[in-house]
Amino acid sequence: MNLLQNVSLASYSGMAVGGNAAYLTEVANRMEVLEALSWAQGQQLPVIMIGSGSNIIWRDEGFPGLVMVDKIMQFEIYQEDETNTYLTVGSGENWDSVVARSVEAGLTGIEALSLIPGTAGATPVQNVGAYGQEIANVLVTVEAFDTHVRDFVTLPAGDCGFGYRMSRFKTVDRGRFFITGLMLHLTKGNPQPPFYGALETYFEAAKTMLFTPAVVRDAVISIRSAKLPDPAVIHNNGSFFANPIITDEQYNYLADNYDAVPHWSVGTGTVKISAAWLIETAGYKDIHDAETGMATWAKQPLVLVNEHAKSTADVLTFKAKIVTAVQQKFNILLEQEPELLP
């Protein structure tokens, strides 16, 4: 085991801030996971396992234990027939590469999740979703090390506690499981309309008539690239807030007082509305905050970017300003998407 000490965690966060880890090591397979966990147990140290860190914000105090960086790679067809394909995917695989390879194979089910940063193992934690698709719809099982039983377990998708941008891995069992692999169920053939709003608008403008996984992927990449900053160039965690789900009564109040509130019906008595619209309408579109060195991205206020912030405290202060502004104007509480660790 190659063990590093006193490592800056800013390099393992999309926002590029945070303190140091006492220890850090990379793990490339299950045996290395066990070796690292055994060492940490012997030292009586806490352990966190991360992917690329694209959806992580580290506290300024750092982490006084062992950080395992996931490098578990696998992309294999487990089983297939004329219609269905089951893929086994290592948790350390770059997610967009997984999407690209599945699309190249003519498989549909995750093409709308193109260009989402991070690793495959992070997708169930957040129940990653975009443009009408989400990981819960295609996930069969999650393979993980369960710290309660000190062994590897296989969890069916139905046991993952999925909700909107939510899972048991993020809530009741936060920190319990170290995800090492996924099984995905994708299908052969083409996705069928109707498509999610922005995609449908894109296809109508392009007069697209044939919808293949590759066509949808290209469209999503075009849409996302036009409005989102490149995380390799500009430090950010992607969408910083989840779209709130509110009651019909709350939505009706908004609709009566504002024009064209972006919204989606998500069930009886509830409506999902655009967090970006709330932030913009509350006065935080293209805001550059001198106090914190943070900003909202000009083309998408849902994305907070680190222009010259020096600490996680700066990020959280700017976040609090936005949350307060939205709550005061709409009485709606925005919820943070990136995970604050530890």
Whereabouts are the PLM-identified features?
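Anion-binding (especially nucleotide phosphate/pyrophosphate-binding) glycine-rich loop
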Residues: 1-149, 159
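Phosphate/pyrophosphate- and phosphate-bearing ligand-binding catalytic cores of soluble enzymes
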Residues: 4-5, 10-17, 152-314, 329-342
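Residue-level signal for inorganic ion chemistry
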Residues: 29, 53, 118, 150, ...
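Generic structural marker for isolated residues within well-ordered, non-membrane alpha-helices
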Residues: 98-99, 275, 323
